[in-house]
């Protein structure tokens, strides 16, 4: 229920705002969502924000149900789900349907992270690059 209220507030905040002004407002909301986090959730969200900014600079920064998220053409590609949001023992990095992660008949769309390590960053960088790649039909 809280997530639905957050999503409604996100939509209200950008109602009537278009173009670059809307993207700027959404990017500010993404940074505010990250800054509102604490501890490990914040550390992971901050580092993931850097990864997305560097590996997929064309993705727009916004919030989605209160989560820091990154989108193309208004469709969320990837997001951070803080552990504190649902009282879980790990933060999740999620990828939505428009992420280009297809790998045969089965692939993961969510990854648990309990600590930001060089190995985790390397894997997430590769996932973000792949997820953000524009699909080519053929």
Describe each region flagged by the PLM:
Residues 1-138:
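Charge-dense, helix-prone N-terminal extensions
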């Amino acid at each position: 229920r809280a997530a639905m209220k957050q999503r409604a507030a996100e939509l209200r905040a950008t109602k009537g705002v278009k173009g670059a002004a809307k993207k700027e407002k959404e990017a500010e909301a993404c940074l505010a969502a990250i800054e509102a986090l604490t501890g490990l959730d914040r550390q992971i969200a901050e580092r993931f924000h850097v990864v997305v900014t560097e590996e997929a600079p064309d993705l727009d920064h916004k919030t989605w149900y209160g989560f820091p998220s990154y989108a193309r053409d208004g469709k969320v590609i990837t997001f951070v789900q803080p552990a504190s949001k649902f009282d879980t023992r790990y933060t999740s990095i999620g990828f939505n349907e428009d992420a280009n992660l297809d790998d045969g008949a089965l692939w993961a769309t969510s990854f648990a992270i309990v600590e930001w390590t060089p190995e985790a960053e390397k894997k997430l960088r590769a996932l973000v690059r792949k997820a953000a790649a524009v699909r080519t039909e053929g």
